[in-house]
């Protein structure tokens, strides 16, 4: 149990730092769409789809790796709270179209990336 807790802790910290770095680098590039948050959510969705595909096929992987990557890293990397706050800020600024676009791209993009990764890595022969 302690190993699992440490895996979530380490993965979560690493994912959070990665999200912060993405936000620092890419959010300033566009006024209305926080590109760093979008990148974090899409990358995290892809990684979790890939992880679920691999872990469902490779049952001999230590559960520590599963929680490190999915619950830890992807949980720290992706962020519904930051995404929600950014949408609220756009709404407060009266940028309703941008807020709606942000919701649309984050949600559908994340679903699409998870499905794509699951499909790609379920079909692969990597063991």
UniProtKB/Swiss-Prot annotation:
Catalytic activity: fluoride(in) = fluoride(out)
Entry's transmembrane regions: 4-24, 35-55, 71-91, 103-123
UniProt GO MF annotations: fluoride channel activity; metal ion binding
Control of this protein's activity: Na(+) is not transported, but it plays an essential structural role and its presence is essential for fluoride channel function.
Location relative to the cell: Cell inner membrane
Gene Ontology terms: biological process: cellular detoxification of fluoride
Highest taxon listed in the record's lineage: Bacteria
Gene Ontology, cellular component aspect: plasma membrane
Broad class of where this protein is predominantly found: membrane
Job of this protein: Fluoride-specific ion channel. Important for reducing fluoride concentration in the cell, thus reducing its toxicity.
Family membership: Belongs to the fluoride channel Fluc/FEX (TC 1.A.43) family.
UniProt protein name: Fluoride-specific ion channel FluC
Lineage of the organism: Bacteria, Pseudomonadati, Pseudomonadota, Gammaproteobacteria, Enterobacterales
Gene behind the chain: fluC
């Amino acid at each position: 149990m302690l190993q699992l807790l440490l895996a979530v802790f380490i993965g979560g910290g690493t994912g959070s730092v990665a999200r912060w770095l993405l936000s620092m680098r890419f959010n300033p590039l566009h006024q209305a769409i926080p590109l760093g948050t979008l990148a974090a959510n899409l990358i995290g969705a892809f990684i979790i789809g890939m992880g679920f595909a691999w872990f469902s096929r490779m049952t001999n992987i230590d559960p520590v790796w599963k929680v490190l990557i999915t619950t830890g890293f992807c949980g720290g990397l992706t962020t519904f709270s930051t995404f929600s706050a950014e949408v609220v800020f756009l709404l407060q600024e009266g940028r309703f179209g941008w807020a709606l676009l942000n919701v649309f791209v984050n949600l559908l993009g994340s679903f699409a990336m998870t499905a794509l990764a699951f499909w790609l890595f379920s079909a692969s022969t990597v063991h």
